[in-house]
């Protein structure tokens, strides 16, 4: 058989819904995130990581270094974007298989929603890790997909989940959410029995627990071999001193509240919800509930009491599964990036639409328009929110570039300055000097998404000048910066941009941006020495 025939045979073996999910994800992702892939607009963390080996064992991410090798440890927007969408597209294909989505249209919608969900936009502001993070999502989906295929698959799934968490722990919530959806699907499948569904549930619990245990065991090995301790990133260091079990009920309640706020409370913290999205989510809730009710009634499935009760239980647990990052990191507030698992709520609607497609033709006629309006409105919101995020970030970059270009022109114009001379920038850019005036930017405001300027800390000024403007100026050590800030002549200097705020002193140029120097935290210092 020729290679062309083998290729066609392989293509025919892939179900249309899986193909639609993959290409729906790839196409939608390219269209929605095109600006991020054709520009370089990372957040403040990305300023120092145009090239970075991503040695993040100190934050519990022991596999991130190896996964980041896929894009050569370098921020290359289009390459990173394509790799990310390829991994996400494969995840979409696995998810449609896991949830038994056999409609090509719904498969394509699943892929589109996975690619357009705004939490992914925040991920692409961390472009230096985006391919690795999307690989983590793929591994999380693979873990559940494998577990569904038997106990041997569960063992392999545990290994996949450990690798996923080794890239980023937050994506364990993706696996948990998908596991809940897999059980929900079984409650609506006439051929599934209570015993089989219990077996699947136990297998999924085993896979999730074994994967988390394996992740932690490997982490301990890495810490031992590298002679490291966990940093205070998201409370990871507290993990070694025990989990706050007394706080567990509060954390569970917080996770559920965060999920409710994310979808139904405009202006909620670490979210981007608007009144428009609330309407979209209410429509999703109505469509999903109607599909669930009609499916139970159509096959008289409601007569088997475990099916409606099991479905309600999975729906009740889904907010906790999506918000599991709060349980995993009890001392931190999950960021929008960490809430990617919330896309599972929309996948649940797609799952229920697929089951609703199995009801009578008259009922499908009622469902179709509402489902189409919901899908179109959701994708429109995602398109606008992602690009609002990118527009705000790009403006912050332009503002920072302009400001620091003018700032260094003042340095070069300082009497006595010579190329290669040390430059001490004491303080950060004053907030009142750079401030975005566009009201819509407030929707996507978060510390991980620059809105006013990118160089929010003293060290970011050096990173921007050196790695973004190619100006060879090195950051001074902490003791030097502290000693400069304590001198009488520095205290007498006016603040930038006033005349005299850039001056030659003690053989170096000093720029006074703030009245005092803010020392780096212990976390920052330890983070810079990570390995």
Regions found by a protein language model. Give the residues of each.
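Intrinsically disordered, polar/acidic, low-complexity terminal segments
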Residues: 2-58, 62-90, 97-111, 197-201, ...
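Membrane-interface alpha helices of multi-pass inner-membrane proteins
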Residues: 153-170, 174-175, 180
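Membrane-interface micro-motifs in multi-pass membrane enzymes
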Residues: 57, 61, 84-86, 105-148, ...
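Hydrophobic alpha-helical membrane-interfacial segments at the cytosolic entry of transmembrane helices
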Residues: 21-26, 195-218, 313
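Perimembrane helix-loop-helix junctions
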Residues: 174-209
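Juxtamembrane "helix-exit" motif on the non-cytosolic side of transmembrane helices
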Residues: 36-43, 116-125, 187, 217-225, ...
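Membrane-interface helix-loop-helix junctions at transmembrane boundaries of multi-pass membrane enzymes
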Residues: 196-197, 285-316
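Membrane-interface transmembrane helices that cradle and orient dolichyl/undecaprenyl
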Residues: 140-154, 186-192
